[in-house]
């Protein structure tokens, strides 16, 4: 029986506040000294982990008692996490270190709804927590045979450089052919709505340059700790816009740099992105990579990234300067640049986020919060709707979680029926919090077909139809799950403008609207004849990077041609063509190309049955 391990730490406050001390975070004035005393109560037969999965800390801040709740960040590392560094003679060394029992936590202050915390417990307690709107830092005091820690406000750290740091992004460093246009809920196609509702995961890779290696004393352990501390905060920030950041790997250029890292940010970013595409992507699958550098960029720039380039093999990249001793300020810069990768530009003066400064403010200040502004959230949503980047949809499996299952962490994991938290916090009458199994007599604890611990009756509607290709989903009476059903693939839809495929109706009209806005339409047939040329944009498919011209019967399965009804555009044959993402703007597989025919994945207009039985994964139902 797995039980929650609750650890209580009592912190006794030293009877005086220090006036000045030099810590890892810098020269600190006005700090409190605390002594953690760990009290552990393990259930009988439980195995002691090196780092517990759930902990509490009791301490006084400004003389007032607070309780800090912490849970291990189980999403920090991917299952295939790896590290690469180089020997003194330049030999590449790649390892897969054990990261299951890691020491990085997130949490909050009890009775403070807006509080956050990011703490490492590797060697004492190091990190920060937000209390009543103010940021506090905690780190061990380096005293012999002492467990003393310092707690202090960020404002009490002496600043080495008073000049504010800024992001180098102006408008866009990767020129997209078209601006992001606002999309209302009613204008969304079924595909866009489904994409928007799906959970998002960024498989993140981090590279540290040679200056970083030298800066941290040529000590790989010290440098990797710095990186883990930073990414743990990045995870916490991006979670605010429902993006999970999983660290899939890191590379430390311990021998020499793989590119010429220089003080001109735009040049360094371009060189890093080129190296990433040519080298890194061939050895490690990931969705986005950043370079963390110890070089000082020209001017106040702290980072730079390509805007809206997530998942792009060339441009899904960013660079960040390790500009401050306090890792959470570096993490804010990194999260900011990752926000650019995810389609978010800088906040304007009218943008708000219930804090003095939001994540996407152009200037990184000591008041920076972990909140995204209303503008950022809207811009990110519009980017997702318009571009639907696919690499962030790949959700890790339950078996990919690197930490062992823990009853009481609110995640239903392998071997558990339910998980409602600890016995003290559980409010679920269906779930036994001591073993994460259903209570006696209960059939279920959650699910669209679960009501008061019992399965809903067979035939009960659990999800209405979302489109004409969808069907109302019904409970079976034997499960809490609401199984997704949809109309037969190949059934005509949208007034015979398309054929159903797995609950959606892919049509050229919807694809034009997604590319050019709500008033767009499909071009005349004559425009599609350009696909017979087999040039850089007009083709049906590629074979070994050679573009194959469309046969006459297949011209509507190549590049999509649309009418953009905006007053300034008189061109009857508009396309979207991006040299770095050539598949964008092609007619999607499954789209109707003639009566009774649909495009397959090879750019051929074939019979409906053949299209849905081709290698695209379509299946006739």
UniProtKB/Swiss-Prot annotation:
Name this protein carries in UniProt: Zinc metalloproteinase-disintegrin-like TSV-DM
SMART domains reported for this sequence: ACR, DISIN
A GO BP entry: proteolysis
Signal sequence, start to end: 1-20
Cofactor(s), names only, from the UniProt record: Zn(2+)
Quaternary context: Homodimer; disulfide-linked.
Organism: Trimeresurus stejnegeri (Chinese green tree viper)
Major subcellular location class: secreted
Motif D/ECD-tripeptide mapped to chain: 468-470
Cofactor binding: number and manner: Binds 1 zinc ion per subunit.
Binding site for Ca(2+) 1: 406, 409, 411, 413, 416, 419
